[in-house]
Design a protein with these regions (language model features):
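N-terminal helix-turn-helix DNA-binding core of bacterial DNA-binding proteins
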Residues: 12-53
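Basic, helix-initiating cap at the start of DNA-binding domains
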Residues: 7-8, 16-20, 59, 78
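Short, intrinsically disordered or compositionally biased N-terminal tails of bacterial proteins
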Residues: 1-6
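Alpha-helix N-cap/N′ positions at the starts of helices
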Residues: 9-12, 177
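Alpha-helix initiation/capping motif
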Residues: 7-10, 112
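Feature captures hydrophobic
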Residues: 41-42, 50-234
């Protein structure tokens, strides 16, 4: 009987899939690449709990499985990492996994666990290039709790970058709030406008920046599913 089960396991498509993505970190590495990260340091920065040696192992594993390929870096130093067609096709798999957790484990999603720097990094990657102004605009984010931290997000040429040191540009708007509250907005648990109305997020600055800035963000890929879940369980 055991031999027969082993034979089926080697034939089962799900077994083949879990052999590729069936550990804690591999789906998250693929998530980062689906979000556009191609450089090792950027992927590592997005996964602060993962050691660099383990990331190296996971990338090599994915390359062996035909999910990732390496290209010479345009700078001539090192490589960049890119999803193959098979890797890109995992997007629907990961989205379904996220929707499952929202449906059945939503109460375990804890925004208070999110690190401020990781949140800012995620936010800057989820910027809508069609809405970001061409001219440079700097937004200062003052995290008031659990730790007081300040970051600057510079929007320019339809992209964004995050600074942990004041870049010295004129500030178009200042956002002040606890990290947890900003994480709730990013995840879709609460809308930006609702948070501003309630006073849990305070925004000041140039009127046109304050008004248009929320539309510059796409928020979490699962934000629409979270909003739907929240509305259904009110």
């Amino acid at each position: 009987m055991i031999a027969a089960m082993d034979d089926f396991a080697s034939f089962c498509p799900l077994t083949l899939t879990t052999d590729v993505i069936g550990d804690r970190w591999t789906p998250l590495v693929i998530r980062e690449m689906l979000l556009g990260n191609t450089r090792f340091n950027d992927i590592a920065r997005s996964l602060p709990g993962m050691s660099r040696s383990l990331l190296t192992q996971r990338l090599k594993h994915l390359e062996r499985k035909g999910v990732v390929e390496t290209w010479p870096s345009p700078s001539g130093r090192g490589n960049t990492y890119h999803l193959t067609p098979a890797g890109k096709d995992l997007q629907d798999v990961l989205m379904a996994m996220g929707r499952w957790s929202i449906a059945w484990m939503y109460d375990k999603l804890d925004p208070s666990e999110i690190d401020a720097e990781s949140l800012m990094w995620w936010m800057h990657r989820r910027v809508d290039p069609t809405t970001v102004p061409d001219e440079r605009v700097t937004v200062q984010f003052d995290h008031t709790a659990p730790e007081r931290r300040t970051y600057w997000m510079v929007f320019e040429r339809r992209a964004a970058s995050v600074c942990v040191v004041d870049p010295g540009f004129p500030v178009g708007a200042v956002v002040r709030c606890p990290t947890e509250q900003l994480a709730r907005v990013f995840s879709g648990s609460e809308s930006w406008n609702a948070a501003v109305r309630s006073g849990t997020i305070d925004v000041s600055g140039r009127r046109e920046v304050v008004r248009s800035m929320p539309s510059w963000f796409l928020w979490s890929p699962w934000a629409p599913d979270v909003r739907e879940h929240v509305l259904a369980h009110r």
